[in-house]
Amino acid sequence: MAAGFIREVYYPEWLANVVLVKKASGKWRMCVDFTNLNKVCPKDSFPLPRIDQLMDSTAGHKLLTFMDAFSGYNQIRMAKEDQEKTAFITSQGLYCYKVMPFGLKNARATYQRLVNKMFGQQIGRNMEVYVDDMLVKSKEELTHLDVLKETFATLKKYQMRLNPSKCIFRVA
């Protein structure tokens, strides 16, 4: 609750269980099992980029920067009328998400649509985006800083935060 991602809820129509999933780092991640909700949601078929095409698009570029959005899905606010559909039960009470949680059927497509709109002027030209992973690319070393400035201006405009521990700048 301190992060502002969830709020307490009473008498929700939907209620999911919490499951703990062990991360590669050995830490545990709390996840909500949205199986029942996902069954009744229509599928959003928004396409994800093909990894092989993204890799091919880096050919001929001298510098690359890899960036990762900080808790990417959690940076998207849920519509007020949809928040209670994400209700889950804990030993402390019932809560729902105010932001898009991991585990929703259409979260990945929703996020990809958002970043495609955000970076539409850059994708294919000097940037590629796969869900919450961003790749900034420059054919000349001298232009890389300008491309990063353009990218950071867009991130600032949409108030998107990065995870600095997962960002790698100026890879040759």
Predicted regions and their residues:
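Retroelement reverse transcriptase polymerase core
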Residues: 1-172
